[in-house]
């Protein structure tokens, strides 16, 4: 699409999202002693000359850093930010993984599936056909009452930073953070996207040749088997390991971000 059209669409989306969040934002600004906002946050950020930290990997969007060269100080790339927080399920998951062959991890994050029962049945059947184990991380969907066979383990939130590297592959909704965790883990990815922003990251997974992607609504038992066979092939496994070596380390991303924020704050204070 022409750049002018893209900008117009994004401005419209920003305003629509602002209408959804405006009430909460106004309340927060009152608590901080700030006046009510009169425009969407992206417009205010740009107009004020604020620091626009790019918290994702440059390799996902080659050429963008060069395109933004004149704004390099305002739009620095730091890599993906993650807190790598431990969860209550981590110990049990680690024990289950160690008790058998490395599983395929399925995570849906903020995407709520319409039928948890059908989804678990589809995953169970596909993995049984391939002779694989499945670790299903429920995210915002409730899988608590769904029965499943022995080769499947259903859990709540887990620490992707420790779980993903222990798996054969990861299958997820293609959220920005989950995609980055998969790339850092060095295992192949199957992106089953649902929304426009998820499709952006799914496209990068395919472009980097670390996996494949399709809409979640177009996924069934047969397509899942086909896609898993593809990403478990040696070339995708090798490529995923290669890309992992090019990712920023979590500690480096956090340190760089903190330094940038401190420097920017000091500059604004002394201006």
Residue ranges and their predicted role:
Residues 1-103, 109-132, 146, 259:
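Nucleotide-sugar-dependent glycosyltransferase catalytic domains
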Residues 64-65, 142-145, 197-202:
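Short, glycine/polar-rich helix-capping loops at beta-to-alpha or helix-loop-helix junctions
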């Amino acid at each position: 699409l022409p750049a002018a059209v893209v900008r117009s669409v994004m401005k419209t989306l920003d305003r629509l999202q602002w209408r959804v969040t405006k009430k909460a934002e106004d309340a927060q600004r009152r608590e901080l002693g700030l006046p009510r906002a009169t425009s969407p946050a992206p417009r205010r950020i740009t107009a004020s000359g604020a620091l626009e930290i790019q918290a994702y990997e440059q390799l996902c969007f080659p050429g963008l850093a060069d395109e933004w060269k004149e704004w390099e100080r305002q739009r620095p790339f730091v890599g993906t930010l993650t807190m790598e927080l431990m969860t209550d399920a981590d110990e049990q998951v680690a024990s289950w993984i160690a008790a058998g062959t490395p599983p395929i991890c399925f995570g849906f994050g903020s995407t709520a599936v319409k039928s948890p029962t059908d989804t678990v049945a589809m995953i169970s059947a596909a993995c049984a056909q391939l002779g694989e184990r499945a670790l299903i991380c429920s995210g915002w969907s409730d899988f608590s009452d769904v029965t499943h066979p022995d080769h499947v383990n259903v859990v709540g939130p887990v620490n992707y930073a420790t779980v993903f590297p222990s798996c054969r592959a990861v299958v997820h909704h293609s959220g920005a953070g989950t995609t980055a965790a998969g790339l850092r883990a060095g295992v192949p990815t199957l992106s089953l996207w649902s929304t426009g922003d998820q499709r952006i990251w799914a496209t990068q997974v395919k472009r980097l040749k670390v996996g494949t992607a399709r809409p979640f609504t177009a996924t069934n038992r047969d397509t899942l088997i086909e896609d898993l066979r593809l990403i478990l092939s040696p070339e995708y496994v090798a490529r995923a390991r290669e890309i992992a070596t090019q990712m920023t380390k979590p500690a480096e991303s956090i340190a760089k971000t903190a330094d940038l924020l401190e420097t920017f704050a000091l500059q604004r204070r002394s201006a």
